Amino acid sequence: MSKVFNFSAGPAMMPEAVLAQAQAELLNWQEQQTSVMEVSHRGKLFMALASQSELDLRQLYQIPDNYRILFLQGGARGQFAAIPMNLLKEKGKALYLTSGHWSATAAKEARLFGDIDEVNILEEGNELKIGQLDFSHIADQYDYVHYCPNETISGVEIFDLPKVGNAVLVADMSSNILSRKIDISQFGLIYAGAQKNLGPAGITLVIVREDLIGHARQTTPTIWNYEIQSKADSMINTPPTFAWYLCALVFKHLLSLGGIEEIEKRNQAKAQLLYDYLESTPFYRNPVAKVNRSRMNVTFTTDNDELNAKFVAEATAAGLHALKGHKVLGGMRASIYNAMPMEGVQALIAFMKQFEAENR
């Protein structure tokens, strides 16, 4: 069977080594003659897995001791509601820096729970570019400042941290979590849906500073209350054990490759190769300014809808799957998360060259 590369924005490609291990252990996990999906989440073996997964994640990201790690459900959309329910306190208001669809959606949901100010930081001229990031002069009036450092639809990534003074910085890292080095101590809370870089859909990571826990409004549902979830080790209800197990395997896999430093180098190399090709030809166009081009989601177009549709169809037939751009933007999108090997990017570029030669 010929090799297939999955460029889906999510659920996304998983590391082949992780899938192979999961396949090998599927019917007999930890010599129990049963699947990890069938064991008690409160049993000794799964509790050990949960504990080790947290230790491995702490090692990967150098997470300080005064941060709690939660493995929750409901996706990033669930956190759009959970964050204001837990973090809106005395000031009763938050600032949302919007740069695309997902940050704007988060702001819209947060308005159900408090006073939300929104500032659009995306400049839309000939190229998409992030504008002002210094909000230190106004941030103190807010309980927290929220932003999304990588917008999957447009392929816009923010590499510099917003300046927010002493305010709490909250980041939706669903699409670039574990893709590059970050200083966790600069954030009050980080959250991410798993289905791009962490594991399969169905589990959500929250990394939250301890002093931000314990302030949820009284009407906060139990499953969204960080204090209750933290005290219950993310097991106030039965967690998605198989998804958690796969995340644990991904963490081990990333450590075996050399950790975040090595992963970042690989991601830089993959993205640079693809962007260099896009720069070399007028046949395709990327709409994002160089300084904000995403390493995870590379968008491009021929500026011809019929030609774009033909590209996607022929690419799929060639084993390059899920390259259709989001309906909001159109064109094509290659999502090249951690699990995408350099071989996949090279195969895509080879196809793009062939398609250009046949259709220019």
From Swiss-Prot:
Q: Which domain of life is it from?
A: Bacteria
Entry GO terms, CC: cytoplasm
Family matches, as InterPro entries:
Aminotrans_V_dom (IPR000192), Aminotrans_V_PyrdxlP_BS (IPR020578), Pser_aminoTfrase (IPR022278), PyrdxlP-dep_Trfase (IPR015424), PyrdxlP-dep_Trfase_major (IPR015421), PyrdxlP-dep_Trfase_small (IPR015422)
Give the cofactors, semicolon-separated: pyridoxal 5'-phosphate
| Residues bound to pyridoxal 5'-phosphate | 76-77, 102, 152, 172, 195, 237-238
Name of a matching Pfam family: Aminotran_5
Which UniProt keywords are listed?
Answer: Amino-acid biosynthesis, Aminotransferase, Cytoplasm, Pyridoxal phosphate, Pyridoxine biosynthesis, Serine biosynthesis, Transferase
Q: Where in the cell is it found?
A: Cytoplasm
Documented EC number(s): 2.6.1.52
Q: Which reaction does it catalyse?
A: O-phospho-L-serine + 2-oxoglutarate = 3-phosphooxypyruvate + L-glutamate; 4-(phosphooxy)-L-threonine + 2-oxoglutarate = (R)-3-hydroxy-2-oxo-4-phosphooxybutanoate + L-glutamate
Chain's role: Catalyzes the reversible conversion of 3-phosphohydroxypyruvate to phosphoserine and of 3-hydroxy-2-oxo-4-phosphonooxybutanoate to phosphohydroxythreonine.
Per UniProt, subunit arrangement is: Homodimer.
Question: Hey, which family's this protein in?
Answer: Belongs to the class-V pyridoxal-phosphate-dependent aminotransferase family. SerC subfamily.
Q: Which HAMAP family match?
A: SerC_aminotrans_5
Protein's name in the database? Phosphoserine aminotransferase
Underlying gene: serC
